[in-house]
Amino acid sequence: MNTQAATSPQFYLTAPAPCPYLAGEMERKVFTHLVGPRAPEMNDLLTQGGFRRSQNIAYRPACETCRACISVRIVAREFQPNRTMRRVAGVNADLTSSVFAAQPSTEQFSLFRTYLDHRHQQGGMSDMSALDFAIMVEDSHVKTKVIEYRLPKVDEDSDRPGELVAVALSDILSDGLSMVYSFFNPAMEKRSLGTFMVLDHIRRANEMGLPHVYLGYWVNGSRKMGYKIRFLPQEHLLSQGWTRYEPESGVEE
C-alpha cells in the first residue's frame, strides 16, 4: 500500500441542502476527517485555507452557484477597539475567565440549552441533547480548549464559583486562535457577551504571540454574521488569497 495515500486526507462532497443563511439558495460542503497524528497539522493548514472544524470534521462551502461565505480572520496585533468595544470591555471587567481541557459539564450544557432556546430555536442545533453537546466538545483530535467566563463569587469565602455566563470552544493553531463555537446567557444582553469573547480572544492571541483570530464565515447581508466585520483590521480569504478588508463608510470607529 502507498503510505502517502494511506495518510493523506480524503475529501468528500455533501448533497445539496437548503442554505441556512440565504433564503432560496442551496448549499454544498466539501469535508474531510481530522483524525490521527496529523490532525493538528491538517487543522492548521485547512483553517488557513478557509475550512472550519466541527467535531472531527473540517469543512468549507462548495456551493455550485454562490460564493457568499467568506472566511474572516482578525489581525490581532494591529487591532484597535472602537468606542463601543471599549464600553463592552469595561462593562465586563468584573468577569473572570478560565481555560480548561475540552471536557463538557452539566453547567455548560444548561447554559448552552438556554442560549439555543432563546437565539436559535429553528436552527440545526436546536434539538441537541446532552450527549450531542458532549460529543461537540470532546470529539477533537486537535488542540482544543474550553474558556469559561463567570461573574464574581456571591460569597468570597465560598468554594462555589460565580455564575457561568459565557463559554467559548476554541482551537489553538500555529498562527492564531480559531473560535469554533461560543454561547452565552441571552438574558445579559447589555453585556454584549459575544463581542466580549471575541475581544478576549484577541487579547489572548496577542499574549500568546499569535497573529490571528479566526471567526469563521461572514455572509454579506446576513444579520447573524454582521458582527464579524466590526473587528478591524481583518483579512478575508478571496480568490487571490488572504486580503485586507477595506470597510465601507459607516463602520463605527
UniProtKB/Swiss-Prot annotation:
Query: Which PANTHER family would you find in this protein's record?
Result: ARGININE-TRNA-PROTEIN TRANSFERASE 1 (PTHR21367), ARGINYL-TRNA--PROTEIN TRANSFERASE 1 (PTHR21367:SF1)
The UniProt keywords, alphabetically, are:
Acyltransferase, Cytoplasm, Transferase
Name the Gene Ontology biological process terms: ubiquitin-dependent protein catabolic process via the N-end rule pathway
Q: Which GO terms describe its cellular component?
A: cytoplasm
Q: Which family does it belong to?
A: Belongs to the R-transferase family. Bpt subfamily.
Q: What is this protein's name?
A: Aspartate/glutamate leucyltransferase
For this protein, the Enzyme Commission number is 2.3.2.29
Show the catalytic activity.
N-terminal L-glutamyl-[protein] + L-leucyl-tRNA(Leu) = N-terminal L-leucyl-L-glutamyl-[protein] + tRNA(Leu) + H(+); N-terminal L-aspartyl-[protein] + L-leucyl-tRNA(Leu) = N-terminal L-leucyl-L-aspartyl-[protein] + tRNA(Leu) + H(+)
